[in-house]
């Protein structure tokens, strides 16, 4: 059986408590991530991560448009929520959470580097015009199944999962390892429904550990 990989989506300081774009309860994902890291390491399975990595003038930032954060608009001809400045390259906010077992992470894939378009997915920018190196890395390592968790459920996790499925990967989502922005109260619930409908299998961490042994 080809190996699996655990993909940790954007477990970065700016998405956790005190960060520029703090996701409610975002910190609670780190313990889940560390348990999954230990689980994967004990089975020889890869651990990888995505990292939002924006230039300071990124077009998704509300500050670049003179609008309030969370204002809807357009960027590169695509619908866009304008965010607080976050995950600026080489800033403290862009770093992976300090309590995350980072030494186990075999590769980190940057996204959102092009200032003209946002990139929620760890595979593509939002216009699907440019790929990150994630898909090539997975194929080079003959990985065809992913365990996905991270931040935020309703944006980067959702679009990463949907792209992975479209690329032909089997995808397992650890629901209690995810937290959402929830601009609308049901956004995360709808995101999980969308992922499931597209073919992802949803597990709690306890269910995953029980069913996978």
From Swiss-Prot:
Give its E.C. classification number: 3.5.1.19, 3.5.1.-
List residues binding Zn(2+): 52, 54, 86
Q: Name one GO cellular component term.
A: cytosol
How is activity influenced by pH?
A: Optimum pH is 7.2.
UniProt record, GO biological process: pyridine nucleotide salvage
- By its UniProt entry, which Gene3D superfamilies does this protein fall under? Isochorismatase-like (3.40.50.850)
InterPro entries, per this entry? Isochorismatase-like_dom, Isochorismatase-like_sf, Isochorismatase_Nicotinamidase
Pathway it acts in?
Cofactor biosynthesis; nicotinate biosynthesis; nicotinate from nicotinamide: step 1/1
What UniProt keywords apply to this chain's record, in alphabetical order?
Hydrolase, Metal-binding, Pyridine nucleotide biosynthesis, Zinc
**Induction details:** Is constitutively expressed in very small amounts in E.coli.
Catalytic machinery residues: 10 (proton acceptor), 111, 156 (nucleophile)
Q: Name one GO molecular function term.
A: hydrolase activity, acting on carbon-nitrogen (but not peptide) bonds, in linear amides
SUPFAM superfamilies given in the database record: Isochorismatase-like hydrolases
What's its catalytic activity?
nicotinamide + H2O = nicotinate + NH4(+); pyrazinamide + H2O = pyrazine-2-carboxylate + NH4(+)
Q: Which NCBIfam families match?
A: PRK11609.1
Q: Could you tell me what this protein does?
A: Catalyzes the deamidation of nicotinamide (NAM) into nicotinate. Likely functions in the cyclical salvage pathway for production of NAD from nicotinamide. Is also able to hydrolyze the first-line antituberculous drug pyrazinamide (PZA) into pyrazinoic acid in vitro, but this reaction is not considered to be physiologically relevant.
Q: What family does this belong to?
A: Belongs to the isochorismatase family.
Tell me the protein's name: Nicotinamidase
